[in-house]
């Protein structure tokens, strides 16, 4: 059985205090729910000397707002709190769908919104115990100089596996980042980098404090998730689609975002252009879903074959669009 190594533990009471600790210690790592981090520590993917817990910072909890003014969700809100909040289920049901698809009831009651947005990228090679990785040879993401999945590449192709990120992008959400230098607002799309090693566009001492979702404005959205089992599993493909239809059924706005097919969520802008300005006819749906599948570039570093996952992009985008057109 894999165990945790020794480490120091800090429990600051404010975001500013937590950020100051990150500045003072280069070996400090943030933890909130820990449902992703602790297994990674057990596998020695991360070896922190100091864990900085955010669980004692009350200001990071809570959900406030509505569909008319927009919604602000504290980063320490658990996924169960998000999935069952009337503020979410009433005006942003797609966010409830995505959060309810994560893990199990036990995991959702511990895992946090901020943790899901910031969780590490995944790879079938990297996500192995230390002894296995040491025997085969380390990879570019941890301790080595080659990507074992794509040896000819000079970058890491570990996969973004957040269920919340594609939905947040489809809703045009933003996040608040706080550090000792102050606070800044960043669109969720800009939060992610297409790099399996350094996948977040955050300074080391920045802390994600809130997710801000703009007024719904009649936006309809759907999230579909491909996985090997009906529960627990990380996405092998996540599809978030949002559309705004006028009274005649004409699509005036479309967003199509693919998760788990790259090191960051992928926005299918060509599909969005196809959908905008017309009704969601079968032909439009086929064109948009085909274009999304063409754009997807999954690697053979997670469950199921990359060919199957790529083919299912078209199927899932089409399903989501048809559900929204109904």
Label each PLM-derived region with a short phrase.
Residues 1-326:
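C-terminal structural segment of proteins
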């Amino acid at each position: 059985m894999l165990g945790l190594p020794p480490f120091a533990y800090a429990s600051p009471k404010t975001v500013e205090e937590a950020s100051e600790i990150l500045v003072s210690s280069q070996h400090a790592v943030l933890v909130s729910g820990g449902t992703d981090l602790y297994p990674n520590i057990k596998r020695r993917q991360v070896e922190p000397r100091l864990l900085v817990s955010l669980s004692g910072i009350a200001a990071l909890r809570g959900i406030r707002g509505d569909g008319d003014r927009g919604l602000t969700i504290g980063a320490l809100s658990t996924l169960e709190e998000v999935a069952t909040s009337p503020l979410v289920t009433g005006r942003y049901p797609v966010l409830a769908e995505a959060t309810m698809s994560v893990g199990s009831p036990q995991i959702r009651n511990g895992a946090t919104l901020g943790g899901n947005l910031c969780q590490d990228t995944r790879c079938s090679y990297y996500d192995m115990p230390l002894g296995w990785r040491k025997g085969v040879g380390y990879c570019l993401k941890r301790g080595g100089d080659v990507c074992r999945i794509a040896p000819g590449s000079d970058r890491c192709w570990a996969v973004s596996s957040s269920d919340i990120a594609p939905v947040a992008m489809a809703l045009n959400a933003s996040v608040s980042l706080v550090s000792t230098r102050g606070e800044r607002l960043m669109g969720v799309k800009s939060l992610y980098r297409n790099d399996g090693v350094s996948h977040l566009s955050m300074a080391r001492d920045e802390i994600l404090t809130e997710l801000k979702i703009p007024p719904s404005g009649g936006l309809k959205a759907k999230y579909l998730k491909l996985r090997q089992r009906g529960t627990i599993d990380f996405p092998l493909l996540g599809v978030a689609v949002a559309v705004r239809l006028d009274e005649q059924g004409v699509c005036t706005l479309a967003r199509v975002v693919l998760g788990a097919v790259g090191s960051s969520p992928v926005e299918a802008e060509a599909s969005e252009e196809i959908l905008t300005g017309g009704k969601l006819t079968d032909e439009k749906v086929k064109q948009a879903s085909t274009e999304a599948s063409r754009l997807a570039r999954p690697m053979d570093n997670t469950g199921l074959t990359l060919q199957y996952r790529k083919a299912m992009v078209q199927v899932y985008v089409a399903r989501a669009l048809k559900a929204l057109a109904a």
